[in-house]
């Protein structure tokens, strides 16, 4: 009979924690006029992509959302994409 304690166990898989793309020395600044940068954080339907997907820190996600909303209000970005 096989002893359970003698079966080799696998090490658990550790996913590397993503770092915030807006943190660091030469990171881009979040600006409502930088439409190209803001479009990377908007889904194809026009919704703001959550930080758990984009790996943006909580503070920078709030800044990003504010910049996207400001750009929408000024007509630089669409509210909804059909």
From Swiss-Prot:
Gene3D superfamilies membership: Ribosomal protein S18
SUPFAM superfamilies the record matches: Ribosomal protein S18
Pfam families found in the cross-reference section: Ribosomal_S18 (PF01084)
One of the GO BP terms on file: translation
Region described as Disordered: 1-20
Disulfide bonds: none
GO cellular component, one term: cytosolic small ribosomal subunit
Domain of life: Bacteria
NCBIfam families per the UniProt record, alphabetical: S18 (TIGR00165)
Family from the record: Belongs to the bacterial ribosomal protein bS18 family.
PANTHER family for this protein: 30S RIBOSOMAL PROTEIN S18, SMALL RIBOSOMAL SUBUNIT PROTEIN BS18M
Name of the molecule in the record: Small ribosomal subunit protein bS18
Annotated organism of origin: Brucella canis (strain ATCC 23365 / NCTC 10854 / RM-666)
Taxonomy of the source species: Bacteria, Pseudomonadati, Pseudomonadota, Alphaproteobacteria, Hyphomicrobiales
Encoding gene, per UniProt annotation: rpsR
